[in-house]
Amino acid sequence: MIILKKKLAGVSEQSLSLFLTRARKAAGVRGQVQVLVTSSDELRGLNRRFRRKDKATDVLSFPAIVDGEAGDIAISSDIASEYAYELGHSLDEELRILILHGVLHLAGHDHERDKGEMEALESELRDKLKLPSSLIERTTKPAKKAAKRKKR
């Protein structure tokens, strides 16, 4: 299930829900996944509460503790919009990239601890699902460009 906190131009809950189903199957994730697309402020609050990091982030994943559910994913529409602009693709595509990234975390992958396994799998699934470059491959580039733009 996809929950958009606000209307986003060119983004359809139904289309993202269909993609979520494809991403879950591709990653081997069973059970329901809920995706909340919301503000950077809300992601910052979630990040502070659950990871003790007082900063906004693009995507967070929360594995489920209830049978029949895989977990929840929260995505910042603000950061996704910045990434999409910087990388020259649509917001819808960026949300799909972030959904795939979150689903891989729900499947138990962790790019902060593994030795490139998640990056390789994300790249493979990105190609299979016809998405632009993966989140892991490009994480620092958009953030640096956005920071430069804000300083001007």
From Swiss-Prot:
Biased amino acid composition, Basic residues: 141-152
Protein name: Endoribonuclease YbeY
Role of this protein: Single strand-specific metallo-endoribonuclease involved in late-stage 70S ribosome quality control and in maturation of the 3' terminus of the 16S rRNA.
One cellular component (GO) term of this entry: cytoplasm
Family classification: Belongs to the endoribonuclease YbeY family.
Cell location: Cytoplasm
UniProt region (Disordered), positions on chain: 132-152
EC number: 3.1.-.-
Cofactor names: Zn(2+)
Binding site for Zn(2+): H101, H105, H111
GO BP: rRNA processing
UniProt remark on cofactor binding: Binds 1 zinc ion.
Transmembrane regions: none
GO molecular function: metalloendopeptidase activity; RNA endonuclease activity; zinc ion binding
NCBIfam families: rRNA maturation RNase YbeY (TIGR00043)
InterPro entries in the record: MetalPrtase_cat_dom_sf_prd (IPR023091), YbeY (IPR002036), YbeY_CS (IPR020549)
Domain of life: Bacteria
Pfam families reported in the protein's UniProt record: YbeY (PF02130)
Lineage, uppermost ranks: Bacteria, Pseudomonadati, Acidobacteriota, Terriglobia, Terriglobales
Keywords recorded for this protein, A-Z: Cytoplasm, Endonuclease, Hydrolase, Metal-binding, Nuclease, Ribosome biogenesis, rRNA processing, Zinc
